[in-house]
């Protein structure tokens, strides 16, 4: 059988991915030639599901035999990945079957009773929920709703996140709910909201096949989004005019394709962005008509601090960080801005000349000019991609705003092949954390708890009395850790994340709070992670296709899957855990008498009755479950619906969808998603939207409007004047190196799943310290030698790697964070972007010495 060119490219991408992980791939599988079917093959049932890993949203076919997932393969009908998977995707069938899978609740006990210093003992779900409910009720009585908190996930299904938002913000009346997406996507959210007044990318992956240039800012797509990278590679190699520019603080695998490769000093991306804006203006490449019609100019607050504790010297000196000043009043607001003119903006960026920015950043003048010309040339369609390099940044919101500035100045936005695109790291950081609104300040569909109209709208949809949802922003992720340490947060439920490994400054801020005698920590997880082992109660969780789910990917694509197999032992989904836990609370336990008086019908009811058996969520009978899914799986059911007697997922989804329909976040009817490979919202009249804000593509832009940034009432986007500022902590004489943390191709985040896949674990069994050979030589170190890396906060032992995939410049070291045996986040600083509250994991000062 002769392969066509696309098959060849797929085979090459697969082979490269496999080779990187040291795994052999059978040629027939790589080139798409099907092996002859056997009797065993016939017995395997196949069904669609989105991949469990990153936010790309690849789809796979899941093979089930005798109640177990036995195989997965790329879904050839999936528009995102077109049958191709990365190396992690090819081993999805093994992520649920680690030998140490948790199958029963575990509670710390001594002498038969709960004791924070006790050992883990298996208990029943009833006993687990009894102790949980007792701790929650005690805290609600003594501390009120601010004494409890939940740390969720961009890996929650859409309805798990929605159930959590209802339970916390409506049931417990606490906004202390935040997702681990705070660590990865919060700066993207605030960047979108400040510039456009509405969240999530205006473009889609279809841009790749229509663009002339790709610019990567702090994004190693070759390893972190390899399927999208394979599409960019195809575009670049098939079209000689296409260019790729890659900017990073160190050289990684994405540099292999780069026409323009730039290594810049940490934090100086801000200066480079302002230079590009200056170049566009001084060379008269501004799209004047577009700017006049569609843009407002603003100057942002600048002395905003670094999100450290209020007592830190950097926060005491800051004048606009929002912390209480000497008079007890907030010192400004880091999110503030004032209107300016185009001329004032032009003057502001004029100081960022090529020569000055070259000196600041270390990028040559020639490289800077070549990059700026890509953006400035009206004939070149450009897509900018970024991930954690921008977002995990003490000026992450600014970085997002500033890349939008460039696209808005040139009008290269909201059209095929042109646009800025924030890539996502988790499978539903967009669909669940952002769209559902599981952040401490958000409600569904971009609404916020501080807006009385938004609260009222949510209360109407949820059937709640006015005033139920609190108006004060809750604790964000880093603030939750600090509050636990300080004894202000007493009860804490952590699900579908591993913050004891992934969070910043573990020794200084996270572990002390979890082991604080005043706190009670619950972790829901499939495996005994670092977080689970530090908890007081561990709840075994179902994962991926052990439940019915939905994810929303980076291009606004919502994808649904059916439950394929049962979870082992007594493991249960996060959705079941939250709904079941809600039964333990009468409304009198959580609401004030005044609030209950506004709706007497709720008296004596449980939170389950009020939130989930409310006439809307329980609207759809079990017959719908069979009707929607019967042609795919005979006698289909799912565990949650079977437990509660109604189609739980459909009820939650349709209630949630009320928030977005008619408000620019329209979702299709629930049943439709079971038939298709996802749809990109807004979905209006059955049609998905590929490009937002532009007439002819977006149903919310009327005929004759051309471009309309309807997130803002005036239909305009904002360009912000924002300066380059240094990092919160920089190398000095003692701690003389920058530390950057991140990921590798073979492992995902903290390795909870990938390190339990034997092939992936063998490929990269432990984390290493990537160091420049000259830096190693100057310290008397050799490749493979054990060293101690230390910051002001902690130290760990690692082996030095002076070769390999990551080539760091002198003065910087890189360490991935997947290895629970080498907790690099003991060293990181808990500084955040003061606007987004997202942690900067890319910059702190360390030293390296022989162990």
Swiss-Prot record:
Cited CDD domains: MopB_CT_Nitrate-R-NapA-like, MopB_Nitrate-R-NapA-like
A Pfam family matched in the record: Molybdop_Fe4S4
GO molecular function term, any single one: nitrate reductase (cytochrome) activity
Function: Catalytic subunit of the periplasmic nitrate reductase complex NapAB. Receives electrons from NapB and catalyzes the reduction of nitrate to nitrite.
Coiled coil: none
Keyword Isomerase: no
Top-rank taxon, per record: Bacteria
Signal peptide: 1-29
Subunit organization: Component of the periplasmic nitrate reductase NapAB complex composed of NapA and NapB.
Top-level enzyme category: oxidoreductase
Family: Belongs to the prokaryotic molybdopterin-containing oxidoreductase family. NasA/NapA/NarB subfamily.
PTM text: Predicted to be exported by the Tat system. The position of the signal peptide cleavage has not been experimentally proven.
Record-annotated 4Fe-4S Mo/W bis-MGD-type domain positions: 44-100
Cellular component GO terms, alphabetical: membrane; nitrate reductase complex; periplasmic space
EC number: 1.9.6.1
Cofactor: [4Fe-4S] cluster; Mo-bis(molybdopterin guanine dinucleotide)
This protein's encoding gene: napA
Residues reported in the UniProt entry to bind Mo-bis(molybdopterin guanine dinucleotide): 88, 155, 180, 184, 217-224, 248-252, 267-269, 388, 392, 498, 524-525, 547, 574, 741-750, 825, 842
Protein's recorded name: Periplasmic nitrate reductase
Residues where substrate binds: 817
InterPro entries recorded: Asp_de-COase-like_dom_sf, CT_Nitrate-R-NapA-like, MoPterin_dinucl-bd_dom, Mopterin_OxRdtase, Mopterin_OxRdtase_4Fe-4S_dom, MopterinOxRdtase_cofactor_BS, Periplasm_NO3_reductase_lsu, Prok_molybdopt-oxidoreductase
Residue segments, region Disordered: 317-338
Cofactor comment: Binds 1 [4Fe-4S] cluster.
List of residues binding [4Fe-4S] cluster: 51, 54, 58, 86
Catalytically driven reaction(s): 2 Fe(II)-[cytochrome] + nitrate + 2 H(+) = 2 Fe(III)-[cytochrome] + nitrite + H2O
Record keyword Cell wall biogenesis/degradation present: no
Keywords for this protein: 4Fe-4S, Electron transport, Iron, Iron-sulfur, Metal-binding, Molybdenum, Nitrate assimilation, Oxidoreductase, Periplasm, Signal, Transport
């Amino acid at each position: 059988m002769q392969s066509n060119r696309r098959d060849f490219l797929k085979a090459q991408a697969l082979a490269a991915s496999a080779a990187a992980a040291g795994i052999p791939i059978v040629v027939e599988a790589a080139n798409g030639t099907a092996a002859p079917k056997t009797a065993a093959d016939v017995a395997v049932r196949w069904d669609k599901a989105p991949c469990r890993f990153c936010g790309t949203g690849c789809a796979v076919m899941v093979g089930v035999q005798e109640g177990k997932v036995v195989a997965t393969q790329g879904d050839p009908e999936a528009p995102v990945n077109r049958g191709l998977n990365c190396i992690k995707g090819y081993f999805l069938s093994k992520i649920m079957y680690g030998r140490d899978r948790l199958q029963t609740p575990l509670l710390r006990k001594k002498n038969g009773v709960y004791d924070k210093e006790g050992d883990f003992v298996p208990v029943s779900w009833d006993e687990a929920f009894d102790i949980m409910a007792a701790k929650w009720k005690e805290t609600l009585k003594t501390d009120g709703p601010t004494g409890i908190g939940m740390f969720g996930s961009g890996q929650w299904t859409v309805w798990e996140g929605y159930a959590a938002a209802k339970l916390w913000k409506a049931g417990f009346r606490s906004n202390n709910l935040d997702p681990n997406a705070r660590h990865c996507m919060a700066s993207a959210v605030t960047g979108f909201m400040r510039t456009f007044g509405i969240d999530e990318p205006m473009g889609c992956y279809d841009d790749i096949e229509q663009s002339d240039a790709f610019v990567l800012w702090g994004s190693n797509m070759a390893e972190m989004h390899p399927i999208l990278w394979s599409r960019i590679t195809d575009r670049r190699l098939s079209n000689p005019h296409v260019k790729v520019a890659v900017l990073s603080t160190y050289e990684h695998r994405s540099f292999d394709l780069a026409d323009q490769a730039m290594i810049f000093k940490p934090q100086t991306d801000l200066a480079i962005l302002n230079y590009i804006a200056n170049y566009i203006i001084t060379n008269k490449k501004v799209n004047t008509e577009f700017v006049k019609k569609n843009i407002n100019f603003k100057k942002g607050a600048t002395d905003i601090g670094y999100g450290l504790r209020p007592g830190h010297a950097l926060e005491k000196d800051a004048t606009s960080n929002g912390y209480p000043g000497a008079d007890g009043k907030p010192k400004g607001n880091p999110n503030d801005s004032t209107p300016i003119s185009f001329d004032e903006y032009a003057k502001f960026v004029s100081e960022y000349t090529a020569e000055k920015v070259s000196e600041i950043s270390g990028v040559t003048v020639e490289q800077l000019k070549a990059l700026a010309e890509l953006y400035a040339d009206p004939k070149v369609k450009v897509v900018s991609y970024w991930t954690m390099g921008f977002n995990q940044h003490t000026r992450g919101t600014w970085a997002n705003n500033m890349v939008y500035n460039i696209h808005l100045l040139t009008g290269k936005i909201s059209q095929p092949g042109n646009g800025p695109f924030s890539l996502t790291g988790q499978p539903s950081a967009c669909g669940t954390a952002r769209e559902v609104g599981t952040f401490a300040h958000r409600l569904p569909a971009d609404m916020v708890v501080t807006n009385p109209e938004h609260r009222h709208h949510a209360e109407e949809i949820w059937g709640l009395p006015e005033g139920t949802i609190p108006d004060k922003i809750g604790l964000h992720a880093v603030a939750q850790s600090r509050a636990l340490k300080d004894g202000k947060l007493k009860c804490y439920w952590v699900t579908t994340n591993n913050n004891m490994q992934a969070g910043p400054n573990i020794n200084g801020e996270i572990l002390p709070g979890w082991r604080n005698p005043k706190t009670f920590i619950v972790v829901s997880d499939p495996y005994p992670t670092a977080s689970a082992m530090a908890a007081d109660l561990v709840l075994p969780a179902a994962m991926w296709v052990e439940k019915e789910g939905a994810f929303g990917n980076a291009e606004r694509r919502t994808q649904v899957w059916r439950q394929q197999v049962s979870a082992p032992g007594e493991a249960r989904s996060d959705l079941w855990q939250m709904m079941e836990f809600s039964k333990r609370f009468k409304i009198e336990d959580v609401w004030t008498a005044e609030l209950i008086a506004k709706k007497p019908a709720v008296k004596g009811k449980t939170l389950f009755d009020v939130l989930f058996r409310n006439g809307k969520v329980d609207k759809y009978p079990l017959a719908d479950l069979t009707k929607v899914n019967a042609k795919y799986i005979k006698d289909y059911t799912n565990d949650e619906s079977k437990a509660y007697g109604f189609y739980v997922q459909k009820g939650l989804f349709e209630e949630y969808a009320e928030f977005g329909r008619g408000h620019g976040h329209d979702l299709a009817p629930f049943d439709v998603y079971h038939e298709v490979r996802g749809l990109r919202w807004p979905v209006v009249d059955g049609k998905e939207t590929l490009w937002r804000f532009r007439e002819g593509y977006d149903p919310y832009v009327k005929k004759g409007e051309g471009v309309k940034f309807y997130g803002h009432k005036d239909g305009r986007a904002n360009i912000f004047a924002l300066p380059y500022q240094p990092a919160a902590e920089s190398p000095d004489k003692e701690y003389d190196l920058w530390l950057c943390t991140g990921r590798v191709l073979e492992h995902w985040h903290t390795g909870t799943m990938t390190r339990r896949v034997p092939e992936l674990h063998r490929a990269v069994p432990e984390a290493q310290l990537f160091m420049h050979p000259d830096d190693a030589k100057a310290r008397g170190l050799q490749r493979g030698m054990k060293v101690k890396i230390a910051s002001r906060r902690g130290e760990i032992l690692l082996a030095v790697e002076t070769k390999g995939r990551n080539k760091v410049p002198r003065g910087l070291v890189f360490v991935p964070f997947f290895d629970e045996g080498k907790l690099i986040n003991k060293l990181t600083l808990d500084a955040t972007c003061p606007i987004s509250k997202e942690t900067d994991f890319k910059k702190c000062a360390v030293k390296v010495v022989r162990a």
